[in-house]
Amino acid sequence: MKFTPEKPSLFGETLESLTERVVEAGFPSFRGKQVMEWLYKKRVDEWDAMSNLPKAFRTWLDGQYILYLTNSLLDKRSDDVTQKFLLELEDKSLIETVLIRAPQTGVGQESSRKTVCVSIQVGCAYGCKFCDSGLAGFKRNLMVAEVVSQLMHICKMEDAHTKRAKEEIASFDNIVFMGMGEPLANYDTLVQTIKILNAEWGLNFGARRITVSTSGLAPRIMQLAQEGVAVRLAISLHGATNEVRSQIMPVNKKYPLEELIPAAKAFKDKHGRMLTLEFIMIEDINDSLDQAKELTKIAR
């Protein structure tokens, strides 16, 4: 199912696409860049806060766009380390975004390295046995603006606790696409989101600090390797042989290890980034010595 909002969000635009619309509406092209600065550097959430824009232009923006596409329904904290957000989208769909704090010189928001785990689909179609995301099935792909809005929601919240907002940089250190959904199954949204995050006019967030976790869509891994977005790749493995992995991850029946591992290594060779192999130990299924031995062969 595809959802189309009454008005698009500005977070789905690139500088190029926004500038094109601005010029078509009869405004100077430089207004596009000014808007992006207010969005990503100043993190404003209302049109009137864009104080260097003429009222007529702000009125036009208000008629064309909305800002945020997410509304926080629940904020659950755990020992000052993990903070989970239940976010409601415009069509009342629910997704989760998680902020993980890793204390460095002490426990506390200012001294923590922060990682944001974002969702890219509502539900999931892949049915991995250890994951709750697919229990209710797949509902729809998220739009670019819905993914970016998750990150900007965290930015605005954390701005109150850090000095980074004054420096006009993101108020977190890493982004992982490990929330609800399979990132490579919403491929175009994934790539466009990464480009917005990476852009100088966007969050100016380094690709090496972005990790894409996949259940193993081998052809998409090969395609991503050619995109010019040198993100990190994590393979949700959880089984070191086809027999075991297929029990845990149905996707393995379509893309077995003989296809997945070469694709992952080709991605690594293309970008020079170390691969992450994710492996949850499940008693009496994948925790044998034989599995450990096979895993070491894959990891070499």
Protein language model regions, located:
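Short aromatic/hydrophobic contact patches that present stacked aromatics
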Residues: 84, 115-119, 211, 278
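Flexible, acidic/Gly-rich N-terminal and inter-domain linker regions that tether
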Residues: 1-114
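Intrinsically disordered, low-complexity terminal tails and inter-domain linkers enriched
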Residues: 105-110, 162-168
